Amino acid sequence: MSRTSLIKLIHVARRELQLDDDTYRAFLMQKTGKISCRELTVTQLEQVLGAMKERGFKKQNKYPRRRFKGHVTPREKVYKIWQQMAEDGFITDGGDVALDKYVQRLTAKRNGGQGVSTLAWCHGDTLLTVLETLKQWHIRCIREAFSRHGLPLPVSPSGRELRGYDAMTAAYAHARKTRRMAQ
């Protein structure tokens, strides 16, 4: 690590360890015999940083490592939502045949009576329509479940009612996990 980077990191550590100027300079004097980072060699700077780490400083990455979630296709999302709805008890059959029948009924309305026979054949706008319609149905089921159990609909920290799919499903999962809602 370069000398400048070490000095910057030592100053970050000083802030995190909440060392006032006198304590910081006494600490440097004790470890190196000098009272300023400017006077220290790279080896001495590394020793000071090591001593600060022993006192509890933890270097944090500038860019925290994020877990790769991968790309999830809309078709995979439809399957997952369908399975989740079955697991939640909103639909009785979470299988592929039942999903294909749902897709056929839904797409028949758009195609003048002739629906797409299976989800695997849906592409583009048709697939997105199936996905968004299924999400809205799931949200309606969740709202009904909250109402049925006498629970208030979830709200954001600002007090506004949650409407987004991810927020609603997370609130429902939390309510089930905390046993506020029967499984």
From Swiss-Prot:
- Predominant subcellular localization, coarse grouping: host cell
Q: Which UniProt keywords apply?
A: Early protein, Host cytoplasm, Host-virus interaction, Modulation of host cell cycle by virus
Q: Which domain of life is it from?
A: Viruses
Q: Where in the cell is it found?
A: Host cytoplasm
Q: Which Pfam families match?
A: GemA (PF06252)
- Which InterPro entries does the annotation name? Phage_Mu_Gp16
User: Could you give one GO CC term from the UniProt record?
Assistant: host cell cytoplasm
On subunit structure and binding partners, the annotation says:
Homodimer.
The family assignment reads: Belongs to the mulikevirus gemA protein family.
Quote the function comment for this protein. Answer: Early protein responsible for decreasing host DNA gyrase activity. Promotes DNA relaxation of bacterial host genome. Modulates the expression of various host genes probably controlled by supercoiling of their promoters. Host genes affected include DNA replication and cell division determinants.
Q: What is this protein called?
A: GemA protein
> What is the gene name?
gemA
